[in-house]
């Protein structure tokens, strides 16, 4: 019987079919993102191109850098006689049509989708007001015995230095989560898992970050009195964060919240701009890693799930989100992940463990 990493005709055929499905899926998702923007926004094409000229080169450089690191690492292991399982085929995969086809299509789809999302979030979501904050406040209080969840997190994590740690985990340390898509592009094994991750990543931006966010438009607690409400509901949280920012800051959250509000008030479109609370894309990206982690090994699954839970708690603690923003995000992501996984063979049948040419 062929070993798990042996390149057999059946595995080569399965990988080729998955690659074709993946390319069709990501091109379709990017097309939907662009269509939504063109149909619902008056911004036109210029801001999309401007944002894309920032995202595109950065994404490409990071991908090529990680690709170079991977190629050098495999070559070094071969030179040292420490051949890794399945790595002998990697240089051949590096020069294959499937590999480069996936890479180029994926980078283009990512650039188009994220650029469309950015402009959509800045020009469509909230353009007719943030309508559902009051509803989500009520949902949160129904789940937490009449209290706002931030009251509980700040009662337990009362130190400003606890808030500082959460702020670090929520913002600067979140970069690897955002780069998960590019890591999957240059990785070697488990194509079914990688295709599921990347498809879910892009679909999450469109289905959750664009369609659902516009249908359920809300600004989040920190913007009480500015973008919704009369400023009384969350003023204690806003004052507390301002005080802690003075004593233990500066917090990235406070800077980012002020920055996004300034962009919103001036009608500017910038990378990372736009205000939207429900559902939380921050939590979507965190739980994408958690879902993937469980398919790699139990320890990683537990570790990344704990981190994702911290992100969820942190989103409430820092005033970005209502608790239910995360709940809806995780439930929607689970459906997207499972649908993509079924399509690529992650569930229901044995997946191809190693990529082939």
Q: Each PLM stretch: what is its role?
A:
Residues 2-18, 77-100, 348-357:
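Membrane-interfacial, low-structure loops and terminal tails that flank and connect transmembrane helices
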Residues 93-171:
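Intramembrane catalytic core of multi-pass membrane enzymes that act on lipidic substrates
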Residues 215-295:
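Membrane-interfacial catalytic/cofactor-binding modules of polytopic membrane enzymes
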Residues 217-226, 277, 309-335:
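Interfacial helix-loop-helix junctions of multi-pass membrane proteins
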């Amino acid at each position: 019987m062929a070993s798990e990493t042996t390149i057999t005709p059946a595995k080569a055929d399965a990988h080729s079919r998955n690659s074709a499905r993946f390319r069709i899926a990501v091109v379709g998702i990017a097309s939907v993102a662009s269509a939504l923007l063109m149909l619902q926004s008056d911004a036109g094409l210029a801001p999309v191109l401007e944002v894309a000229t920032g995202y595109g080169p950065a994404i490409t450089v990071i991908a090529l850098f990680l690709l170079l690191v991977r190629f050098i690492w495999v070559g070094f292991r071969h030179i040292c006689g420490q051949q890794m399982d399945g790595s002998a085929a990697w240089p051949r995969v590096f020069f294959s049509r499937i590999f480069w086809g996936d890479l180029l299509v994926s980078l283009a789809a990512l650039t188009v989708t994220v650029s469309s999302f950015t402009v959509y979030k800045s020009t469509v979501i909230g353009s007719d007001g943030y309508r559902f904050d009051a509803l989500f406040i009520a949902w949160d209080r129904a789940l937490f015995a009449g209290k706002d969840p931030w009251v509980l997190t700040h009662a337990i994590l009362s130190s400003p230095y606890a808030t500082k740690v959460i702020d670090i985990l929520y913002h600067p340390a979140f970069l690897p989560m955002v780069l998960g898509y590019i890591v999957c592009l240059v990785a070697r094994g488990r194509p079914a898992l990688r295709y599921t991750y990347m498809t879910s990543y892009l679909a999450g931006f469109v289905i959750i970050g664009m369609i659902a966010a516009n249908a359920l438009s809300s600004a989040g607690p920190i913007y009480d009195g500015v973008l919704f409400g009369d400023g009384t509901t969350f003023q204690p949280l806003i004052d507390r964060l301002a005080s802690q920012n003075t004593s233990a800051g500066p917090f990235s959250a406070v800077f980012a919240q002020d920055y996004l509000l300034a962009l919103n008030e001036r009608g500017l479109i910038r990378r990372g701009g736009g205000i939207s609370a429900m559902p939380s894309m921050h939590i979507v990206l965190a739980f994408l890693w958690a879902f993937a982690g469980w398919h790699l090994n139990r320890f990683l699954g537990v570790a990344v799930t704990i981190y994702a839970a911290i992100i969820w708690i942190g989103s409430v603690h820092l005033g970005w989100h209502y608790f239910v923003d995360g709940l809806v995000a995780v439930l929607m992501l689970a459906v997207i992940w499972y649908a993509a996984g079924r399509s690529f063979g992650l569930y229901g049948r044995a997946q191809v463990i190693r990529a082939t040419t």
